[in-house]
Amino acid sequence: MSKAVAVPSLLRRRLIGGLAVAPLLGLPWLGLPTRAQEAPVVIPPPARDLDATGESARAIFAGGCFWGVQGVFQRVRGVLNAVSGYSGGSAETATYELTTRGDTGHAETVEITYDPSQVSYGELLHVFFSVAHNPTQLNYQGPDHGSQYRSTIFVQSAEEEAVVRDYIAQLDATGLFEGPIVTTLEPFEAFYPAEQYHQDFLTLNPTWPYIVVHDLPKIAALESIFPDKFRAEPALVGMLPAS
């Protein structure tokens, strides 16, 4: 399903994505140089994982524009829901317009609710570091620059923190990435869902230039690298409850 989204606040960042795809659309007047889509990195799974307990659990990841991160995890088997939103700042500044300034403390974040009997926290980390984003880019992802696009995991327990730190050390030791992993760990305090027009954006707008260039390759990589974890029908958010 595809729909046009007329949201002025999106244009600043999404125009950058449009510059990258302009040659594909036959728009030479937009043909300015941009960073090419980076290939995913095939990496080993975590040597350490959380114990599977309970009917559901949450993971809170930030890895650049939440459109692509949400779209990836919505297609992972065992994920029950993946909501785009903001973490790291206050409730008063948890809006797209304010977060894009880069001075609120917020990161564009995805809250992932998953079934631990079907997919583990470590398996979600595996996807996050491999195909969902580039963990070696400090305070940016592709064309999006600023601390709101930082690579961050919001940890909810000492056990989660230990698993993440061990995995980052494990991955750095492999030398598979072009540079050191810059992903930070922050204590989780609160998650604020993003505006409705951001939810399910990748699925609803597959021809949006930014999506075509920066996010659809992530979906293809997920299916290629993790075929046993890939689900063709995403777990969509739909309409958020009225606040």
Residue ranges and their predicted role:
Residues 2-243:
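Flexible coil/turn and secondary-structure edge motifs
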